[in-house]
Regions:
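Rhodanese-like catalytic fold shared by cysteine-dependent sulfurtransferases
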Residues: 1-17, 21-135, 139-266, 270-373, ...
Length: 504
């Protein structure tokens, strides 16, 4: 068992990563707080992105199953030289560091924050009866706002609050901040409080889920965007000075030397709130500043490693994220850029060596016509969107618990590196691999042969509270209750640290 492992590693104060390589569904159903989920099915891409230094101390949770053994072997093949194997198991209940759900680090932190700040909350019925003159603001990224929101709400992501405080105040009306549940609205309201905003504001309690639970319909495809940015960083610099967050001004020609001077740190470009983890030049990862705070344990695998946040324009996105990362216990600084970063060049697939044949479209068709197994190892979401007629969806972790098929199989993968990694895992388990077809070459296939797929029960997707945004009211009730209970289930030393930092 691993009770207390994360807390002991964290309290030691030395850099470390605690990795759980089970598939997403199993991890969400129960995991050790502080562990980062990098599933075996995407381990190669995930670990090299989140822990690029092959000498970095990695603590691998060993669930004593074939998939855990395969993960250990894969890390060794990738050159990770400092891997500690940590035997573990499900303790049979939740609490004392064993939790369920996703983004638990951020959600538990948000609940601690809510209890400390004591900010006003407005329920849906109170809004309709007494606060219809207030302005509703959805503080999620705009793309999520467009999917669904509360009728009449405007898009104002958390990471742009600092850049829009004057516009908020100029409205002369109460700002009601909401998200889909609780965490991001709590963070947003507390951001305004920390910034010294003196206009009226409150939290719309329970967000869109509470709105639905009260029997109201959501609005879809809304387009009212309140958020704006400015090229003037003066106001943001005032917040950085007030909060004592170190920052540098970095011009376009100086980015390379700046990154080299900060090599080994966590480098995030938070300048685009729609970003979802795009690799940028110099090894910088581009992601949403709003979601970096709401999904911290999906972005950060290396603890006790300083964070550098890159931003341009007003810099409000970096200032927002820096303030809350520091409150969570991270060492953080900001780099205000004179221009935008370029995306990293795509890897040259032609240089990848593989012992497995890489099939062209006609070769794949020949295998299919002879009724040989054609197995798709992409994500279930990708398979559901488009698949080869007659192919079957599989997940590599599930495959390792069973017997290999009697005849050679064709593997469909995202690309050649993904295919090679998957084929290596299967071959080590006794599979015969006839070849790899990278779905990046799917444009060569006959369009009539590509159809939506049915992956069945997909272990790479979470089933916990899965219906909360699709009309399942019980899932919504359970989800909101789960969020509020989280602080009592995480490791006590982390909880104590958050209280200490928030009190300072």
């Amino acid at each position: 068992m691993s009770r207390g492992l994360f807390a002991s590693l964290y309290e030691a104060g030395r850099p470390f990563a605690l990795i759980d390589t089970r598939e997403r569904r199993d991890h969400v159903d129960g995991h050790w707080f502080g562990s980062t989920n990098i599933p075996l099915s995407v381990l190669t891409a995930g670990i090299t992105r989140m822990v690029p230094d092959r000498d970095f101390p990695v603590h691998l949770l060993d669930w004593r199953d074939p998939a855990s053994n395969a993960a250990a072997q894969r890390l060794s093949q990738l050159g990770y030289a400092s891997v500690a194997h940590c035997p573990t198991s499900h303790p049979g209940g939740f609490g004392e560091g064993f939790v369920k759900g996703e983004y638990v680090w951020s959600k538990a932190f948000g609940e601690v924050l809510a209890h400390r700040c004591g900010l006003p909350e407005v329920t849906p019925s109170e809004y309709l009866q007494h606060h219809r003159d207030a302005l509703l603001f959805d503080v999620r990224p705009t793309a999520e706002y467009r999917q669904f929101t509360i009728p009449g709400s405007q898009s104002l992501p958390n990471s742009l609050l600092l850049a829009n405080m004057e516009a908020l105040k100029a409205s002369g009306r109460t700002a009601l901040l909401h998200c889909a549940g609780r965490t991001r609205s709590i963070i947003g309201a507390c951001t305004l409080k920390a910034a010294g905003y003196d206009g009226p504001f409150a939290i719309f309690k329970g967000g869109t889920q509470a709105w639905q639970l009260d029997g109201h319909d959501r609005e879809h495809q809304a387009g009212r965007v309140f958020a704006g940015d400015t090229d003037n960083p003066a106001a943001t610099r005032a917040f950085l000075d007030k909060w004592r967050i170190p920052f540098d001004r970095v011009e376009a020609g100086d980015i390379g030397p700046f990154v080299e001077a900060h090599r080994g740190r966590l480098l995030f470009d938070v300048s685009d709130d729609a970003a979802r983890g795009r690799p940028m030049e110099h090894g910088i990862l581009k992601l949403s500043g709003t979601n970096l705070i709401q999904q911290t344990d999906q972005a950060v695998a290396r603890y006790h490693v300083p964070v550098v946040l890159f931003d341009h324009g007003s810099g409000s996105r970096a200032a927002f994220a820096a303030y809350w990362l520091r409150a969570m216990g991270f060492s953080v600084q900001v780099a205000l850029l004179g221009g935008r970063l370029d995306e990293a060049p795509a890897p040259d697939a032609g240089q990848i060596e593989t012992p497995f044949p890489v099939l062209a479209a006609d070769e794949l068709a020949a295998h299919w016509k002879h009724e040989r197994p054609v197995l798709d190892f992409r994500s279930s979401a990708a398979f559901r969107a488009a698949s080869l007629t007659g192919s079957s969806w599989l997940n590599v972790s599930a495959c390792l618990s069973g017997s290999p098929p009697p005849e050679p199989a064709v593997i469909i993968a995202n690309d050649i590196p993904h295919g090679v990694g998957t084929a290596d895992l299967l071959a080590a388990h006794g599979w015969q691999v006839a070849g790899i077809f990278p779905w990046s070459s799917a444009t060569q296939l006959e369009p009539a042969g590509i159809v939506p797929g049915d992956p069945g029960i997909a272990i790479d997707e979470s089933a916990l509270f899965a219906g909360r945004h699709y009309g399942n009211m019980q899932d919504s009730r359970d989800y909101l209750a789960w969020e509020e209970e989280l602080p009592g289930q995480i490791d006590e030393p982390i909880l104590a640290q958050w209280h200490r930092l928030l009190a300072s």
